A protein has these predicted regions:
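N-terminal targeting signals for export/organelle localization
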Residues: 1-38, 150-151, 171
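A short beta-strand-turn-helix
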Residues: 36-57
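Active-site acidic short loop of glycosyltransferases
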Residues: 53-55, 85, 112-113
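Short pre-active-site segment immediately N-terminal to redox-active cysteine/selenocysteine motifs
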Residues: 55-57, 61-65, 135
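Short, thiol/selenol-centered motifs that function as redox-active sites or metal-ligating centers
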Residues: 66-70
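Structural microenvironment flanking redox-active thiols in thiol-disulfide oxidoreductases
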Residues: 71-110, 121-127
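Thiol/disulfide oxidoreductase modules built on the thioredoxin-like
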Residues: 110-112, 120-166
Length: 171
């Protein structure tokens, strides 16, 4: 009787193992950095999260009280306008502790040409693919595969970032 039960279990395990689907090469899904951006967006420019894979993405972490962050906004808008049509996307991630309460009026007032996301508690505590954000602004450049290709602490200069974006867009 035990042998029969063991044989049935083995057959069941083998049958179920054969039902498992195997992903095709290159379809492992978005990178952990892109998955970390699955956050609520506020303001007039929503994030179409499904359009991020395959694009070069500039992720800038900021806070509404951070003066260098605010000073960097025109540079980010210019980069989006200049490179957006070629497959580039700027994404602003707000680390304000009051979240939507502060970021929604901010995003509506500035009417930026790129999405503004509201960070969640795990991200604020450094538990995301981006790790702990040590200072603001903090900017990451992701390649078309969603991997970090560049990073800047503090204000990023337009020409430096633009050159890095152009290089990734050509790949």
């Amino acid at each position: 009787m035990r042998r029969a039960a063991l044989a049935v279990r083995c057959a069941l395990v083998l049958a179920l193992a054969g039902c498992r689907t195997v992903p095709e090469a290159g379809s492992a899904g978005p990178s952990p950095y892109l998955r970390a951006l699955a956050l609520p967006s506020v303001g007039p420019t929503p994030l179409d999260w499904n359009r991020l894979p395959g694009r070069v993405v500039l992720v800038s972490f900021f806070a509404t009280w951070c003066f260098p962050c605010l000073a960097e906004l025109p540079t980010l808008e210019a980069l989006q306008k200049e490179h957006g049509p070629q497959g580039f996307q700027v994404v602003l991630v707000g680390l304000d502790l009051d979240g939507t309460k502060v970021l929604e009026p901010f995003a509506n007032q500035y009417a930026l040409n790129f999405p503004v996301l509201v960070s969640d508690e795990p991200m604020q505590k450094g538990r995301s693919a981006f790790g702990l954000i040590p200072s603001l602004p903090c900017t990451f450049l992701l390649d078309k595969e969603g991997q970090v290709a560049g990073a800047w602490q503090g204000m990023a200069g337009h020409s430096d970032v633009s050159r890095a974006v152009e290089k990734l867009l050509r790949r």
